[in-house]
Amino acid sequence: MSLGQLSYTPVTDVGIGAIELYFPQNFVDQNDLEKFNNVSSGKYTIGLGQQQMGFCSDNEDIVSISLTVTRKLIETYKISTDSIGCLVVGTETMIDKSKSVKTALMDLFPGNSDIEGVDIKNACFGGAQALLHAIDWVTVNHPLDKKNAIVVVADIAIYEEGPARCTGGAGAIAFLICPDASIPIDRQFSACHMKNTWDFFKPITPIPSEYPVVDGSLSLSSYLEAVRMTYTYFISKVNRHTTGIDGLNSFDGVFLHSPFTKMVQKGLAVMNYTDSQLRHKQLNGNGVDHKLDENDRAGLAKMIELSAQVWKEKTDPYLVFNRRIGNMYTPSLFAQLLAYLAADDCVTGEKSILFFAYGSGLASAIFPGRVRQTSNLDKIRQVAIRAIKRLDDRIQFTPEEFTETLQKREVFLRSKEIPKSPSETSLFPNTYFLDNMDKLYRRSYTLHEEPNGVQNGNGIHH
């Protein structure tokens, strides 16, 4: 018998069957940051479109937030750990140059070591690639063993003192990937644009640092180029293999990676204009006589004007997490899906959605998905609604306290004192935290539980 000749029934509608979101309890207000940094009023809140920024103290790292969100996913949806055959982590937040975050998550799967997958890294794009990889894995493997996959996208985004510090954030999202999913991803229509750029990177330097090197203008132009190229490739692929798509009009929600929400608005404007050029149609009845250039300020402003209705209906309403948490890196794109699922618009009929994923360096992709009225969709929607409400349960810190917290992270990272113990700061209930680093730099974690099982969501100090 040849193993390659085994026959089985293919699976359909592979995609997201369950979702959980974690974000830290700490946040700082962007209005306060404007005053603290002595910049003009509205520079962060209007110019960048940001309201608040979440951040982690030195007692949370990439492993702790990944443990937290994965455990929440398993418990919320009562997932059997024996049903998982693949676990992939998308992150650019590194605490080890060799050992993957995924290996630490194996502690949550006692008795099941047959779980494929490791970490995937390329700036903010690693999460999208992890999702696509898991979809491929389930498509191939589920017919044989009936096993599903889990994808974790998580990052802690912080910047050194200066103009970019206001664009940080932190968060983690976990997905269950399975057949007959509530949010299937039509992976066969994904299209990508890859290129060697130096718009944002984190070199290994003599002095340990969590901070990236950023070329702001190159980052913007690279992002907009990626939108144009991926959308062009996507429409070309769709037109070659199917009929009936009417560009962006075919989608009820359009989600783009969000370094900050004004960047999303610019990206959508380029996508909308590219859509018009490809279909040779006027936008909102306002045609343009000449080709617009996204790298020209006036041209981009015109694109934004022409895309106002699409922005209002398909993208802007779903940026609540991005505005109030900031740039979570890999989760930033998928936080918009959660906000969309919390809205009343998705409760009737099948909906079509579109994702644009981007990671500096650069890697980018567009892929479509659908929201189906399955038996599990209501559970997912309740998780999304609770996550939005949990934004109001966070603790506000002053800019001075925020700055001190980042200094604590620097001290913890660079201190030669071994073993190390981070400071004690507030956490949401049922959150893992970094407890200790021993003389071999091995990190240990503890689950912070609410006393007596009470979960008030208001945070306590442990």
UniProtKB/Swiss-Prot annotation:
Pfam families: HMG_CoA_synt_C, HMG_CoA_synt_N. It catalyses: acetoacetyl-CoA + acetyl-CoA + H2O = (3S)-3-hydroxy-3-methylglutaryl-CoA + CoA + H(+). Changing residue 314 to R: Reduced sumoylation. Pathway: Metabolic intermediate biosynthesis; (R)-mevalonate biosynthesis; (R)-mevalonate from acetyl-CoA: step 2/3. InterPro entries: HMG_CoA_synt_AS, HMG_CoA_synt_C_dom, HMG_CoA_synth_N, HMG_CoA_synthase_euk, Thiolase-like. Its EC number is 2.3.3.10. Disruption phenotype: RNAi-mediated knockdown results in sterility, slow development, reduced body size, severe paralysis and reduced pharyngeal pumping. GO terms for biological process: acetyl-CoA metabolic process; farnesyl diphosphate biosynthetic process, mevalonate pathway; sterol biosynthetic process. Ubiquitinated. There is a cross-link at residue 408 (Glycyl lysine isopeptide (Lys-Gly) (interchain with G-Cter in SUMO)). One of its GO terms (molecular function) is hydroxymethylglutaryl-CoA synthase activity. The active site is at residues 92, 124, 257. Keywords: Isopeptide bond, Lipid biosynthesis, Lipid metabolism, Steroid biosynthesis, Steroid metabolism, Sterol biosynthesis, Sterol metabolism, Transferase, Ubl conjugation. (3S)-3-hydroxy-3-methylglutaryl-CoA binds at residues 124, 167, 219, 257, 266, 327, 360. Belongs to the thiolase-like superfamily. HMG-CoA synthase family. PANTHER family: 3-HYDROXY-3-METHYLGLUTARYL COENZYME A SYNTHASE, HYDROXYMETHYLGLUTARYL-COA SYNTHASE. This enzyme condenses acetyl-CoA with acetoacetyl-CoA to form HMG-CoA, which is the substrate for HMG-CoA reductase. This is Hydroxymethylglutaryl-CoA synthase. It comes from Caenorhabditis elegans. The lineage of its organism: Eukaryota, Metazoa, Ecdysozoa, Nematoda, Chromadorea. The gene is hmgs-1.
